[in-house]
């Protein structure tokens, strides 16, 4: 992993984005915001990383990419001269979108922002990158309420890294507008007691299996990327 101080130097030298050792770093404003429940973010998670309750983040509109970053983890560090804890990094899970934030900006849980700043600044300069989620447990597949035998929406959660695609009974899922679910429409009946799901990571790893699922509930794959 790149040394934090080295990272801060790189960010300061480069402006908006720095690429080093296959890592892309961004900088922008970090601001605090309250989210009462992880599932109330735009990703609408039915299950999430265990630390997301206190370590959540909303990505700016320009880097939101239509929900594709939901569930990924971000490591953020303060790069502002006013910060007391410039060598402290915090890991956060993407659960929401910040429509008014500019490119590079993040809305963060207040406790996480205080940890990297040393106080509650309101707004501060930060640097950040995408990282593997630490100790994510195993991947879960969650069946959206409202799914039926001809329209099925499934959410992959607790993934270590980002998701590239998801298929249901061999059919490529499409991203649902407004919430992090992949869905299919089928002319053939999809039995909930025997749904084949395969999820592919951004690195090409695949987790798959056949599961008995219920609306509004998640099943544990007992696997991880």
Pin down the residues of each PLM region.
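Mature exported/compartmentalized surface modules and terminal targeting/interaction regions
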Residues: 2-104, 111-225
């Amino acid at each position: 992993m790149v040394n934090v101080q080295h990272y801060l130097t790189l960010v300061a030298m480069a402006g908006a984005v720095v690429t080093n050792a296959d890592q892309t770093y961004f900088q922008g404003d970090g601001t605090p915001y309250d989210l009462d429940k992880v599932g109330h973010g735009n990703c609408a998670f039915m299950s999430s990383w265990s630390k997301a309750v206190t370590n959540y983040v909303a990505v700016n509109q320009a880097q939101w990419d239509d929900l594709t970053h939901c569930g990924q983890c971000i490591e953020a560090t303060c790069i502002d001269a006013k910060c007391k804890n410039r060598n402290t990094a915090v890991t956060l899970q993407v659960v929401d979108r910040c429509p008014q934030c500019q490119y590079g900006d993040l809305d963060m849980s207040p406790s996480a922002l205080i940890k990297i700043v040393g106080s509650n600044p309101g707004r501060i300069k930060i640097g950040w990158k995408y990282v593997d989620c630490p100790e994510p447990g195993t991947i879960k597949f969650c069946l959206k309420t409202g799914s039926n035998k001809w329209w099925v929406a499934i959410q992959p959660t607790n993934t270590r890294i980002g998701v590239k695609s998801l298929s249901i009974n061999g059919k490529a899922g499409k991203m649902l507008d407004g919430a992090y679910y992949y869905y299919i429409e089928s002319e053939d009946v999809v039995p909930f007691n025997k749904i084949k799901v395969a999820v592919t990571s951004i690195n090409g790893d695949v987790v798959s299996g056949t599961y008995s699922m219920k609306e509004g509930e998640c099943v544990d794959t007992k696997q991880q990327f």
